[in-house]
Amino acid sequence: MSAPASSSAIAPSQPTAPGHARHSASWSASASDPSGATCAVAPCTSLTPPRTRFDASQLQAHLSSTLAARLRNASWDKSDKDKNRALSRSIAEVIKLKMLEIEPKGFKFIVQVQLVENLGQGGSRPGVSLARHGQCCTGHVFE
């Protein structure tokens, strides 16, 4: 396989109800310990239900096997952009279906699949800047 691929999935745990605008609030408080270090303290309210987190560990094995199965015999053809785009989309669809199988309600999913030509360089999965509190991110690089 001459095209490394990386796939990342982000699952925010705060759903937006249909017909409602999404609002965000930022809470910050800090407390100092005797050593002078500060740490964030989350506000505690009884009105807010506890957030559930997406279980990314269930998805990680699926990412590895899906990328291996789909890319094992694939080859990079720079001139065939439609083939590369179709392969990326098909991988993303399979991963998103698995995410919906793991946790069908209460999450919005973002799946990104990137196929790039391997010119002898190493592969890496860049950090995802979209992940915030209450979200999780998982990824896999296949070479």
Swiss-Prot record:
Region (Disordered) residue spans: 1-37
Cross-referenced InterPro entries: Tctex-1-like, Tctex-1-like_sf
Top-level lineage group: Eukaryota
Family affiliation: Belongs to the dynein light chain Tctex-type family.
Protein name: Uncharacterized protein UM12046
Originating organism: Mycosarcoma maydis (Corn smut fungus)
